């Protein structure tokens, strides 16, 4: 029998990146349109990447098994 490989969730693979230290980085959404009503602070913070909290990082790692 052939060995069964885990499938990578392609949606998650496009949205998350694993850093050299093993943290999971993601980019915030919601700043591509309808920006006139948003404050400058909110738009500026949306440009920055952020890290997935540790309590859900394990679930994200299951979605991207070959990037970890």
UniProtKB/Swiss-Prot annotation:
Q: Which InterPro entries match?
A: Ribosomal_bL35, Ribosomal_bL35-like, Ribosomal_bL35_sf
GO CC terms, sorted: cytosolic large ribosomal subunit
Give one GO molecular function term.
structural constituent of ribosome
Database matches in Gene3D superfamilies: 4.10.410.60
Q: Which Pfam families match?
A: Ribosomal_L35p
Lineage top rank: taxon: Bacteria
Task: Tell me the GO BP annotations in alphabetical order.
Answer: translation
Q: Does the keyword Ribonucleoprotein apply?
A: yes
For this UniProt record, the keywords arranged alphabetically read as follows: Ribonucleoprotein, Ribosomal protein
**PANTHER family attached here?**
54S RIBOSOMAL PROTEIN BL35M, LARGE RIBOSOMAL SUBUNIT PROTEIN BL35M
Q: What is stated as this protein's family in its record?
A: Belongs to the bacterial ribosomal protein bL35 family.
Its protein name is: Large ribosomal subunit protein bL35
Organism of provenance: Persephonella marina (strain DSM 14350 / EX-H1)
């Amino acid at each position: 029998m052939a060995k069964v490989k885990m499938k990578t969730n392609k949606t998650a693979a496009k949205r998350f990146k694993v850093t050299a230290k093993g943290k999971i980085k993601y980019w915030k959404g919601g700043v591509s349109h309808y920006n006139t009503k948003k404050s400058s602070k909110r738009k500026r913070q949306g440009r920055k990447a952020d890290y997935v909290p540790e309590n859900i990082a394990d679930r994200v790692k299951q979605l991207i098994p070959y990037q970890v």
